[in-house]
A protein has these predicted regions:
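A conserved acidic beta->alpha catalytic loop
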Residues: 23-32, 79
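Glycine-rich, basic loop-to-helix element that forms the pyrophosphate-binding segment
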Residues: 3, 51-67
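Conserved donor NDP-sugar-binding/catalytic core segment of glycosyltransferases
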Residues: 84-118
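Short aromatic/hydrophobic "clamp" motif used to bind/position activated sugar donors
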Residues: 72
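Non-catalytic, C-terminal membrane-associated alpha-helical segments of glycosyltransferases
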Residues: 217-225, 231-280
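Short, flexible, basic/aromatic active-site loop/helix in glycosyltransferases
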Residues: 104, 122-143
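A short, conserved alpha-helix in the catalytic core of glycosyltransferases
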Residues: 147-160, 166-199
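Short, well-formed alpha-helical segments that are part of the catalytic scaffolds
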Residues: 1-10
Length: 280
């Protein structure tokens, strides 16, 4: 509930925004806790919605369907958001009417400290860090917002559809890529996506996401996600295979510059992705 506590404390006119909380088929006391927060903050437009279909994409699509605003922002339940998050996104879309989507900075918060084996490449699938400087600008070519800190104009979902429910984490399954798929659709038709550094979240990373077992499953399913998305494109698998082979060369070169523990995890990452991509 830490994320919700930060959301209800947003420094922005409560009459101008709403908060949709999607309970993705939980079996614990989530609903009771949320209803307690709603009762304590009656001045806010907070709404609880239950989504029985398990999966992050189902949950996000449910949030879209139950929201009313022209701009829809998304955060996950393992994040601490800055108190100006809503205001920063509203200002961005007001000042840049050409922007169709936006994303902010994501700063990892390793609850037990950052592991010595964590390199910036290995961190990407684990903690999803995102930083492109301190100024508002279009996202660099080939990049896009992180799923846990993004905002999209409703009209884009009307035009392009919502998040692909074949992708996205679901229960113990760690397949991701739903936001990659969505923003690739946006980029294909040329819709501008902006980076908003001060719309920032801190992504909490507990010890359970740093274990050998978890990271092995995560890296493999990153590859599975890449395979699913590649299969949908003309010559997509061939291009993905060629790209992956090239990444092995870069990986081996990087290992020469890393400390042993970092090299081991970098090789583990590459091996896991390759197995998932090639269907091994």
């Amino acid at each position: 509930m830490e994320t919700l506590e930060r959301v209800v404390d947003q420094r922005y006119d409560a009459s101008k925004w709403e908060c949709i909380i999607v309970d993705n088929n939980s079996s614990d006391d989530t609903r009771a806790k949320v209803e307690a927060v709603i009762a304590e903050n009656k001045e806010l437009n907070i709404h609880y919605v239950f989504e029985p279909k398990q999966g992050l994409s189902h949950a996000r699509n449910c949030g879209i369907a139950n929201s009313k605003g022209d701009i829809i922002a998304f955060v996950d339940d393992d994040e601490d958001v800055v108190l100006d998050l809503v205001r920063r996104y509203v200002e961005l879309f007001d000042q840049h009417p050409e922007a169709m989507a936006a994303g902010g900075r994501v700063q990892p918060d390793y609850l037990s400290g950052k592991p010595k084996w964590m390199s910036h490449i290995v961190a990407k699938p684990i903690s999803n860090p995102l930083y492109y400087g301190d100024y508002i600008k279009p996202f660099p070519r080939g990049t896009h917002p992180g799923g846990g800190n993004m905002a999209v104009r409703r009209m884009i979902f009307d035009k392009l559809g919502c998040f692909d429910t074949e992708l996205g984490r679901s229960g113990d399954k760690l397949i991701g890529g739903e936001e990659c798929d969505f923003f690739e659709r946006m980029a294909k038709v040329g819709f501008p996506i902006y980076y908003v550094p001060r719309a920032m979240v801190y992504h909490r990373i507990g010890d359970e996401k740093l274990t050998e077992e978890y990271t092995s499953r995560l890296f493999y399913e990153v590859g599975v996600s890449q395979r699913i998305r590649a299969q949908r494109k003309k010559n997509g698998l061939f291009k993905a295979y060629v790209s992956e082979i090239g990444k092995w060369g870069a990986t081996l070169l990087l290992c020469l510059t890393y400390r042993p523990s970092q090299s081991r995890y970098l090789l583990k990452l590459r091996s896991g992705i390759s197995k998932g991509l090639f269907g091994k």
